[in-house]
């Protein structure tokens, strides 16, 4: 009985994987717009990606996507008679490997190299004597995510890892 269940599960997984092959392939283009999940403020995340290589690294079904990312996030920390205002603008390039596991679910992971145009500003007593902190610069990090397709061109995604937020979710348009 266990062998039969295992065989049925394997057939189901492989049949779903074969149906999932068109989720992301060479030439596929994605535009994603999302928001970050943070305690303060609402980060905005925008990205574009294009499938450039199928069977990446010799792995059947693995597709390399390259693209760009833009993120914006600002918030203020108010405390009595003073406040800090933080702003981050991230502009970068992404490389993601997509692998279809089940029908309608595009799973992926990869890296981003970006520049963080950041600022921190103090407003309050003794503002002239408070040193401005050093912020911003080049950043490198990893991303893992999944995109579920509602239709051939529209889906929802969730990403975790480096970006304007540790977790971002939103809509994805495929064309």
Where are these regions (language model features)?
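Cleavable N-terminal export/targeting peptides
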Residues: 1-26
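Short glycine/proline- and aromatic-enriched beta-strand/turn motifs that initiate or cap beta-hairpins
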Residues: 19-68, 168-174
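Flexible, solvent-exposed loop segments that connect beta-strands
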Residues: 22-24, 28-30, 57-59, 68-91, ...
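Predominantly the C-terminal beta-signal and adjacent terminal strand-loop region
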Residues: 25, 73-75, 129-175
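Hydrophobic, lipid-facing positions within transmembrane beta-strands of outer-membrane proteins
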Residues: 29-31, 42-46, 64, 89-93, ...
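Residues on the lipid-exposed face of transmembrane beta-strands in outer-membrane beta-barrel proteins
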Residues: 35, 46-50, 93-97, 111-115, ...
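Transmembrane beta-strands of outer-membrane beta-barrel pores
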Residues: 35-41, 50, 70-76, 85-89, ...
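Outer-membrane beta-barrel channels and translocator barrels
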Residues: 53-59, 100-104, 151-153
């Amino acid at each position: 009985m266990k062998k039969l269940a295992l065989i049925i599960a394997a057939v189901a997984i492989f049949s779903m994987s074969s149906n999932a092959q068109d989720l992301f392939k060479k030439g596929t283009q994605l535009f994603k717009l999302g928001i970050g999940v943070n305690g303060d403020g609402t980060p905005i995340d925008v990205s574009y990606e294009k499938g450039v290589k199928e069977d990446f690294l010799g792995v059947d079904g693995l597709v390399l996507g390259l693209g760009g990312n833009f993120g914006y996030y600002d918030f203020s920390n108010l405390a009595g008679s003073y406040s800090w205002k933080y702003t981050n603008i991230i502009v970068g390039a992404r490389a993601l490997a997509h692998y279809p596991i089940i029908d309608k679910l595009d799973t992926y992971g990869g890296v981003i190299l970006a520049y963080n145009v950041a600022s921190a500003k103090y407003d309050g007593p003794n503002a002239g004597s408070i040193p401005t902190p050093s912020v911003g610069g080049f950043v490198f990090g990893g991303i893992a995510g999944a995109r579920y397709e509602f239709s051939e061109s529209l889906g929802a995604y969730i990403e975790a890892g480096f970006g304007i937020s540790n977790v971002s979710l939103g809509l994805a348009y495929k064309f």
